[in-house]
Structures are given as C-alpha cells and as structure tokens.
C-alpha cells in the first residue's frame, strides 16, 4: 500500500520509524498501513515527545502528517504504561480534542489502524459519533477506554454529567487549534483546563496551521516549557506543481450554465467536489443539475452527523462522483496577509525552545470578534476532512477569504496525486444582473481574487485564467433557462424538507439497524433525485446538433434512399396484398351512403 496520509514533499527520507524504538506491535501496524519513512514534522516531534517528554506546539499545514506526529507518542507511552503496571484496571489516559465531528471520525479511523495488533490493551472511543446513543455511550465509557476523541463541547457535557473521569490523564491533544478557537470553543477549553490533573504528569500537544496570539494564550493555559515546531511550507511547496489552478470570470447565471456543460459533456474526469457558500445554493444547484439527469449528493450542516459521515465515506469509496458541499466560512476573519509567520531559514523544521520565545503584552491587543455559527458548529468540510482521490475542486461560489480558498483547494492533489481547481469569479459589473441566481458574497469576488492571486504567488503558485469558448456554450443556454426556471424558491424549500426527512429516517436506521447489519449500509444512497421541481425529461438528453463537432458521434452514411416507399409497408405495419384487405372505397362511409 502506498504512502497515503502525507504529501510526498513532506517525507523525510533520511529517517525511518525504526529509529524511534517503538513497540513491535505499533511498528507492525505502521508498516501494514504502508508508511516507510516519517514526515518532517513526525521525525522532529516523536523523539521530543517520547525521549524528552516535552510538550509540543506544532505549526504545519494539511498533508504534513500531523495526526501520526501525536498519535504515535500517545499509543507508545500507553503501551509502556501497560507493561510497567500489568495490574492496571484501565483508565482514560489520552484525550484528543478536534473541532468537528467529521475530523473526530477521521482520527478514530487512524487510531484503529495503529492499535490493530494491540486492541486488547488499548481501546479508543469517539464521543462525538452520531451513531452512538446516549445510553450506549455511557455503557461504553464504563469500560474505561484509554483514548477518547471528542469536540470540546461534547467532552464538557460528559464531564458535567460525571460520565468521564480524567484524573489519571497523561496526554491532552488539541488538533487544528486555530479552527477550534474559530468555532468558539474557548470557554469549553477553559472549563477543561480547570479539571485537568497537575501539569507535571500531563503531556500536551497543540497542532495548528498557524501560530497567533490566541494560541499563545492556550500555551500558557495548557503547556509546560513546550518545544515549538515550525514547518516551513514554502520550501516544501516549491516542489509541488501537481495542482493546476484556474479561475473563470463569468456572470451569475452563467455559473449554472457552465456547470451543466462541464458535467453533462464529461469535461472533468474523476470525482469533483463543489463548494457553495450557503445551504440554499447547494440545493438550487442540485435541483438544476437534476433537470438534466446529472446526479449529485449534498453535504451541509443541517444533515444529521451520521448521515454526513456516511456521505463522506461513500464519496471516498467512489460511490458518488459529484459532491456539493456547503462551506459556511463567512465567520472566519481574514487575517492580515503581511503578518505571516516568520519564515525559517535553517532547515525545513525549526525547533524553538519556549524559554527563548518572547511575547508582547497580549492584553493591550483587541481580540478579533468571533461570529457565532447558527448551524451545527461541529460541522466542517473544507478543513481537516480527508476526501480521497478528488480530481477537481470547483469553487462554484468563491470563498470570502484567501485563507478559506487554501483549505478548499487542499482537498485535491493530495499524497502526490495531480488535481485541478476551478473558481468561478463574478465581475463587479455583472453582479446583480440576474437576481434569482445572485449571492451577496459575489460582490467582493474580484477583491478576494486579488488577495488569492497575491497569496498563491508568495507560495510560488499561479492562478491561470480559463477562457471558455462562449460560442460553443451558447447553444445550451435556452435549455438551461428552461431548467433553471423550474427550480423555484418554493421547490428549494420543499427539497430541503424532503432531504431532512429522508436523512433523519436514515439516521435512525444507522443508529439502530446498521450497527447489527453493516452490509445493509450499502443500499443507502444520498444522491437520489429529490424531484420537488417539475422535471422535463427531454432536457436529460443532449441532441447531437448542440455538441461540439469533436464530440458528435460519427453518423454513418445511409446511402441511396428511393423516393417511392416500399408499398408493402404502410405506417410501419405490413399490409398484405391478397384479398383479405378490402378496398378503401368500399369502407368510405360517404361513398357508401345512400
């Protein structure tokens, strides 16, 4: 099995996992997954955590191998603890906090792969799973699983209910720290810190894509003389040229037109992840594509957690080719791009001792306001979730920040594979010309595009303008107008209600039935047609005259066709010549009338 978790540019070929002197069962699990060499962040963090027992603060982007950088030390130390105290009855020794339920499930899957040969000694439980009822969760917690994975809010709820005991905790991991803070978990983290055991017996990992003032506050709250690791992504990114980025300047209605042409003619090969900026947009696009027989499935914060999890799993198994994901990133504030974290010059990973780090008085600085998310705040799709083998990321709606753009396009061209991203940009002069297809965030598209181009240029990447031959597309416009007209606001509302009913029903089945019958899960599909809008069947077929000449089928020459038709056939039916057939004149009532 090939290296799948980290991008090739992050691999440290000069090191190996054998140099860490891990437990044989853990080493065997790592080999069975397919990992031969650690990544740069792993080769730096694991020795510091295992040998020096240091707290770790790591800054590294998606695909750098952050998950194994903290999981390997956690599992190894728990195994050592079990060997030293064989009479131990079991207790919660490690807690991993993540911002979203999707990421919690993803971390659980990695843990299960790592403990496959020592599952009798280490148990792991995802507290944020939507598949487990409250009573079942309480019964599972009585078994004292060694590792717990949860969102901060879920852990606080269980601590308040005294269902979880962390008095003997040895490890605390906060993954995607910057996203945890963005989602408004600061108060929950404070409550958790008040219940932790003494810092001398606790080892902490803070993993983040950025290091800002908020993380400095968490460092003082949770860490004790941490080692700070900074991965210089700029050096790594220089060798990553397998992601090709395009942008298309297009009107609001023409977004739907281009989507129809792209997917109906199969211009993109492989799986596509489409991002929209709100839930209504996702359903509108799905219903419009349904008009033309193009199947897709929806992923948004309204759906039940276990349905979202199942959709991601099925998408990764290639059950669906087209996934429309709602990315509510309006609450992520754009940071000043000039105040990027300092670049490292000596090597790709810089280890900074906490004693040498000086910080300014943070009290004088005003904290940036966080916008409360009304939908499920434990939902996140553009960041952290591992979508596998995505050929194309299509930004149907341009994100509202350059930072969000980076997270979106990071879903493709992963683990050394190639990929493309296409972003639709609405020029300011085109904004508001077509009210039904309008979205307010498009007013700032050109401004955001400028920021994105500037940011990508710093990383050595280029956004290329992609010019569609509008003459080739114009022939499809009248069909799109017919299809778009059928998708009204009422139809969208009905679609949302119908989808929620279907998914809630499926959610209950997932909780009760599918735990005992996992094979039945294959029959549950999320890309079924909703049909709340009037579907015109003729739109599903594209006539040859609309296709470009290169895409038309070769019409075989029919040859000579005589002017006179075969008299033996009439209106498609064979007519016998013999006397069984009466003359037409005798059957004419006007001629036979007397």
Swiss-Prot record:
GO terms for cellular component: cytosol; nucleolus. GO terms for molecular function: ATP binding; ATP hydrolysis activity; RNA binding; RNA helicase activity. ATP binds at residues 60-67. It catalyses: ATP + H2O = ADP + phosphate + H(+). Its main location: nucleus. Gene3D superfamilies: P-loop containing nucleotide triphosphate hydrolases. Residues 585-594 have a biased composition (Basic and acidic residues). Residues 242-474 form the Helicase C-terminal domain. GO terms for biological process: rRNA processing. It comes from the Eukaryota. Its EC number is 3.6.4.13. CDD domains: DEADc_DDX56, SF2_C_DEAD. Residues 47-229 form the Helicase ATP-binding domain. Residues 565-584 have a biased composition (Basic residues). A motif (DEAD box) lies at residues 175-178. Residues 562-594 are annotated as: Disordered. Keywords: ATP-binding, Helicase, Hydrolase, Nucleotide-binding, Nucleus, Ribosome biogenesis, RNA-binding, rRNA processing. It holds the Pfam family Helicase_C. It is found in: Nucleus, Nucleolus. ATP-binding RNA helicase involved in the biogenesis of 60S ribosomal subunits and is required for the normal formation of 25S and 5.8S rRNAs. Belongs to the DEAD box helicase family. DDX56/DBP9 subfamily. The Q motif is unique to and characteristic of the DEAD box family of RNA helicases and controls ATP binding and hydrolysis. This is ATP-dependent RNA helicase DBP9. The lineage of its organism: Eukaryota, Fungi, Dikarya, Ascomycota, Saccharomycotina.
